[in-house]
Amino acid sequence: MGCCYSSENEDSDQDQEERKLLLDPSNTPTKALNGAEPSYHSLPSARTDEQALLSSILAKTASNIIDVSAADSQGMEQHEYMDRARQYSTRLAVLSSSLTHWKKLPPLPSLTSQPHQVLASEPIPFSDLQQVSRIAAYAYSALSQIRVDAKEELVVQFGIP
């Protein structure tokens, strides 16, 4: 876990040259070791990558946008409008005929014929509400304490040989 470098040794010019070449790849020689020209692939810069990414996002967004202002703004003729209205009303009639059970039910349950009298009457006394709550708690307690004890077997074996 360390490096094998001693700071006591002075760097020679050749060591500094090698270090400079290793750290700065733009200063590499143009000839390869075998004498052929090296082919360096230039990596795209961060700015180019960012620009390409933004361009792809813009293209994707442009393909998903519907330009309403560029659409043909031709108005419908009167007979086309009437045909569509007739078509929609026949479709609604077919759909509403299949939902007849919804029409038969009142919008809200009617518990009384004169709800204004019920709403105008005196509120239920608090003592009555407490009594109903107490009775409900006793009923719950009684139901939760019901136990079934098995006195005999549920399946009885008959004497069949």
From Swiss-Prot:
Top-level taxonomic group: Eukaryota
GO cellular component terms, A-Z: FNIP-folliculin RagC/D GAP; late endosome membrane; lysosomal membrane; lysosome; membrane raft; Ragulator complex
Expression tissues: Ubiquitously expressed.
Positions bearing Phosphoserine: 42, 56, 98, 141
Effect of residue 2 to A: Loss of localization to the late endosomes and redistribution to the cytoplasm
Region described as Disordered: 1-43
Molecular function per GO: GTPase binding; protein-membrane adaptor activity
Pfam families in alphabetical order: LAMTOR
InterPro entries the record matches: LAMTOR1/MEH1
Modified residues (Phosphothreonine): 28
Cross-link Glycyl lysine isopeptide (Lys-Gly) (interchain with G-Cter in ubiquitin) mapped to chain: 20, 31, 60, 103-104
Region span, Interaction with LAMTOR2 and LAMTOR3: 121-161
Residue positions bearing lipid (N-myristoyl glycine): 2
Coiled-coil parts of chain: none
Function statement: Key component of the Ragulator complex, a multiprotein complex involved in amino acid sensing and activation of mTORC1, a signaling complex promoting cell growth in response to growth factors, energy levels, and amino acids. Activated by amino acids through a mechanism involving the lysosomal V-ATPase, the Ragulator plays a dual role for the small GTPases Rag (RagA/RRAGA, RagB/RRAGB, RagC/RRAGC and/or RagD/RRAGD): it (1) acts as a guanine nucleotide exchange factor (GEF), activating the small GTPases Rag and (2) mediates recruitment of Rag GTPases to the lysosome membrane.
The protein's assembly and partners: Part of the Ragulator complex composed of LAMTOR1, LAMTOR2, LAMTOR3, LAMTOR4 and LAMTOR5. LAMTOR4 and LAMTOR5 form a heterodimer that interacts, through LAMTOR1, with a LAMTOR2, LAMTOR3 heterodimer. Interacts with LAMTOR2 and LAMTOR3; the interaction is direct. The Ragulator complex interacts with both the mTORC1 complex and heterodimers constituted of the Rag GTPases RagA/RRAGA, RagB/RRAGB, RagC/RRAGC and RagD/RRAGD; regulated by amino acid availability. The Ragulator complex interacts with SLC38A9; the probable amino acid sensor.
Family, as annotated: Belongs to the LAMTOR1 family.
Name under which the protein is recorded: Ragulator complex protein LAMTOR1
Gene name linked to the record: Lamtor1
